[in-house]
Amino acid sequence: IAQALLGDPEILVLDEPTAGLDPEERIRFRGIISDLSQQKLVLLSTHIVSDLEAVANEIILLRKGVVLEMQKPASLLEQLNGQVWLITVPAADEAALTKQYTCSNVMHTDGKSVIRLLSKSAPRPDAVPTAPNMEDLYLYYFGR
């Protein structure tokens, strides 16, 4: 990255720049990327969604070289409003739901599973809608 900056380019392309960094270094490096973006165009290729949340002003989603979306993060997330749900079930019922739906997280507590999943409509009457995040967005476009 230092070598790429030597020529003071107008466009800086970074491919997975925080992969392998510990959390403290990742945070520090995101600050550097953010500072650089004030002076030049920074293109960031990453599958680490927290990097996008921290620094992206605009997101381009690509699949096999084809642009699927190009929008501000908030606009992309708005598309998923009403499609992300939390369901609390006995731990024994978890497998059936995670097989049937795209699941972005499972938390276990007191013999129960709190499942975060994507579905265009409420998967069950007890499902509670929740705000989408970047991981949900990633799974929506690139998950199963």
Outline where the language-model segments fall:
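Hydrophobic anchor residue at the start of the ABC signature
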Residues: 1
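Conserved catalytic motifs of ABC-family nucleotide-binding domains
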Residues: 8
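Catalytic Walker B motif of ABC-type/P-loop ATPase nucleotide-binding domains
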Residues: 12-16, 21
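Helix N-cap at the start of a conserved alpha-helix in ABC-type nucleotide-binding domains
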Residues: 23-25
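ABC transporter nucleotide-binding domain
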Residues: 29-117
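C-terminal coupling/interaction segments
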Residues: 105-144
